[in-house]
């Protein structure tokens, strides 16, 4: 049973506003961690990870949870396990979703990914541009297309073994 123990368990997230489910990959690669990790509403941390030092770096006003996840995985070697079912029902409309905070979030994302992924970030930024990331973001946020988009993404994760 010990091979199934993790420091962080994460499941899928139902987005009520879009009426769709974010299906996260089984394996969190550098590329996945650059794009975005499972949101904090879908994560369950071993208590020790939250008791170490200060769990959240509050200099990150929007992305403290993202930085904490990457710190646990990259610096502390936390093991993760994906639970292939929905664990959170997210209503939407959170603090990070208004225009000013979205800009701050993008800025903090650049700082955090550079800190943990180093120069790999340039490759991943280029990949996001080439794969039309802004268009994918619009599809994912659309009530009309979100369900289809997330089903396709889950299928790609499944066939690619991620």
Residue spans for each PLM region:
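Residue-level signal for alpha-helix termini/capping positions
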Residues: 1-2, 74
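A short coil-to-beta-strand element that immediately follows conserved catalytic motifs
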Residues: 8-9, 83, 123-124
């Amino acid at each position: 049973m010990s091979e199934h123990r993790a420091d962080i368990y994460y499941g899928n997230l139902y987005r009520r506003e879009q009426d769709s489910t974010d299906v996260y990959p089984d394996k969190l690669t550098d590329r996945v961690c650059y794009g975005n990790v499972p949101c904090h509403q879908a994560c369950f941390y071993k208590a020790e990870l939250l008791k170490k030092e200060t769990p959240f770096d509050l200099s990150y006003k929007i992305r403290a949870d993202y930085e904490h996840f990457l710190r646990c995985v990259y610096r502390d070697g936390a093991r993760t396990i994906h639970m292939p079912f929905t664990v959170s029902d997210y209503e939407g409309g959170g603090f990070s979703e208004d225009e000013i905070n979205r800009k701050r979030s993008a800025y903090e994302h650049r700082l955090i990914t550079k800190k943990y992924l180093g120069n790999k970030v340039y490759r991943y930024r280029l990949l996001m541009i080439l794969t039309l990331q802004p268009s994918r973001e619009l599809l994912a946020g659309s009530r009309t297309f979100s369900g289809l988009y997330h089903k396709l993404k889950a299928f790609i994760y499944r066939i690619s073994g991620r």
